[in-house]
Design a protein with these regions (language model features):
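Bacterial N-terminal signal peptides that target proteins for export
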Residues: 1-9
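Bacterial N-terminal signal peptides
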Residues: 8-18
């Protein structure tokens, strides 16, 4: 196997092994202590937006998020409350560092992106360093293919795509700087 391929494989493995350590940076700063929220009858979307106000984190909720909340939601931390709401209602979320995005699980999708001359390992490295990569949403690469497959909610896919476009602008002139997106679905 040529040295470049071995190096690329080792680099990708090192990045992927290190990704879980970044996971803490992908969560909002949950406030300490118990979080109490009383619901009489409220739209799920409104409760999530109110939750964001209560913890000082902007929350953007997709129009696909539907449902009503009733009754006692139990006590616990703000993180427990949020994760109980999202998992109990078929929702997924992504925190981009400033906004907490909440989507229906039905909105998850997969895109295959042609990187042109950008190396897949460079993409994974850049996304990890920027705090964009999220171990819950896979980025799959194959050395030498020039393609990556990205799965996740729409805000995550958009941020990955924006990063790739910015990286393509940094490729020296005269080189192939195309980034092609192939849309797909994970379900």
């Amino acid at each position: 196997m040529p040295l470049k391929i071995v190096s690329a494989v080792l680099m990708a493995a090192a990045i992927l092994i290190g990704m879980p350590r970044v996971a803490g940076a992908l969560d909002p700063r949950w406030p300490p202590g118990p979080y109490k929220y009383v619901v009489i009858e409220q739209e799920l979307k409104d409760a999530l937006i109110e939750f964001g106000r209560n913890i000082n984190v902007p929350v953007k909720v997709s129009d696909e998020v539907k449902g009503k909340l009733r009754g006692d939601l139990g006590a616990g931390s703000a993180e427990d409350f949020f994760k109980r709401l999202t998992s109990g209602h078929g929702l997924v979320w992504y925190f981009d560092g400033s906004v907490l995005h909440v989507n229906s699980a039905s909105e998850l999708r997969t895109e295959v992106i042609d990187l042109g001359r950008i190396l897949p390992t460079d993409v994974v490295s850049k996304l990890t360093k920027l705090g964009i990569a999220d171990p819950r949403y896979p980025i799959r690469t194959t050395p030498g293919s020039g393609l990556i497959s990205v799965s996740g909610p729409p805000p995550y896919i958009v941020l990955v795509r924006q990063t790739l476009i910015a990286m393509a602008r940094q490729v020296p002139q005269g080189e192939d700087t195309r980034v092609r997106v192939f849309r797909g679905s994970s379900g």
